[in-house]
Amino acid sequence: MDKGYAYEAGGNIYFDTSKLKEYYVFHNFNEEDLEVGVREGVEEDTNKRNKADFVLWFTKSKFDDQELKWDSPWGVGYPGWHIECSCISMKHLGERLDIHCGGIDNAFPHHTNEIAQSEAYLGHKWCNYWFHILHLNTNS
């Protein structure tokens, strides 16, 4: 938050994607292309400043039964999906990665958000190469 990349709204801490020059690193689209609620059960988050903003820390969530919670400066809560992976990577692999890989379904928003928050925090390029693997579908 001190660097201006995050904001508090509705009890949660959000990453402000408008603060980045290059947010959509894996896709040739922009915020207007994003559709809210495309997936079943996903509701629009009216606390977000921009459609692509994402939660770094939850203190208010529709998941009341979330068991793992910790104290924070913003209240008891838990990390957002993307921050978990960035923290684990940095703790065990350091602040510069050569290669990061995952399924093609993680390119956006997951890996895009990992890059955004990691590079905002570190102040430098985080990962040199990204590999996104396609899925193999079979009949059985």
Whereabouts are the PLM-identified features?
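Alpha-helical recognition segments enriched in aromatics with Gly/Pro capping
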Residues: 1-140
